[in-house]
Amino acid sequence: MQTMELGRTGEQVSQLALGAMLMGTSTGEDEAFAILDRYLDAGGSFVDTANCYAWWTGPGNTGGESEEVLGRWLTSRRGKVFLATKGSAWVDDPARFRDQPGEPRYSGAAGETLRRELDASLRRLGTDHVDLYYVHVDDLATPLEETLEALAGLVAAGKVRHLGWSNVRTWRLERIRALCERHGWPAPVAVQQQHSYLRPRPGANTRSIVDDEQLHHLRHNPELTLVAYSPLLKGGYGDPARRAHPVMNEYRGEDAEARFAVVADLATQLGVTPNQVVLAWLLHQTSPTAVTLIGPRTLPQFEEALSALELKLTGEQLTYLDSAGA
């Protein structure tokens, strides 16, 4: 498994990161451990979670389940893992929001909130620090200065090594960079956004999705590494029935249909799955380079994704994929 530098930190991380979102809820502990062990055996080291994972998966789940499972697994493995978690998207009353449309009320990125949430995450994870800590959902209600000063304090305290941001617009990233430079605070080295082979439709809400503006920003700011989440768009590439999922709302249209068709055609030509074609395409990207974050629910899903590492696309095949669209 290849590694890449995280920003300009000198830190080498796996280009294929393992998301633990469903571990402890939809994925039972035994299967979660099997996936994690297999990932380590394959040479991976970058494991991603969040304090809110995964309250929405069913009654009785309140958040923190993923971190708790990881904490038990990490007992004898902490030194082998680059560990990322997130704060600011905790939900105090998940039962109220689980079946309601729209976005729940998140805890936010106030200084005291982040300090409290990180301490709780460290307890669940059974460690004294995380390697990467994200603001999970950008908080427009809290002054950025307050959030950034609190994050700087967490780094100074040795509880966090590197910082990141997620679900954030490009203008905010630039504002964050400028404030960090002005005050001497540690700046984010990673931005975790939804990114896949499909392109957002015209007029899409791209707060959480990499759009052309953000691609341009990332190409010109190599100190910030893209971590691409939901690369498979909830299984829509391989299963047309999955294209009814709300994740597709910002992609639907003729361009998406044309790209789905090209992925299916190339997968047939190569004797692989559409998911593997998409992951291989992402892993071949160089402008910008990105960490591809997968979140398998089962061990077979993980094995399918892992096999994409062996799929080497030719220049002609990459051009075929890149030129597709309406």
Model-derived features with residue positions:
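Structural preference for beta-strand elements that scaffold enzyme active sites
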Residues: 5, 13-17, 45-46, 80-84, ...
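N-terminal binding-site loop/beta-alpha segment at the start of enzyme catalytic domains
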Residues: 1-82, 156, 232-234
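Beta/alpha (TIM)-barrel catalytic core signal, keyed to glycine-rich beta->alpha loops juxtaposed to Asp/Glu
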Residues: 55, 142-326
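N-terminal small/glycine-rich loop or linker at the start of catalytic domains
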Residues: 7-26, 84-105, 129, 134
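Surface-exposed, active-site-proximal loop segments in enzymatic domains
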Residues: 58-64, 91-108, 241-244
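Aromatic/hydrophobic pocket-lining residues that form the small-molecule binding cavity
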Residues: 32, 66, 114, 118, ...
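Conserved, mostly hydrophobic/aromatic
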Residues: 6, 18, 32, 47, ...
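Short, acidic/polar
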Residues: 27-39, 107-125, 174-178
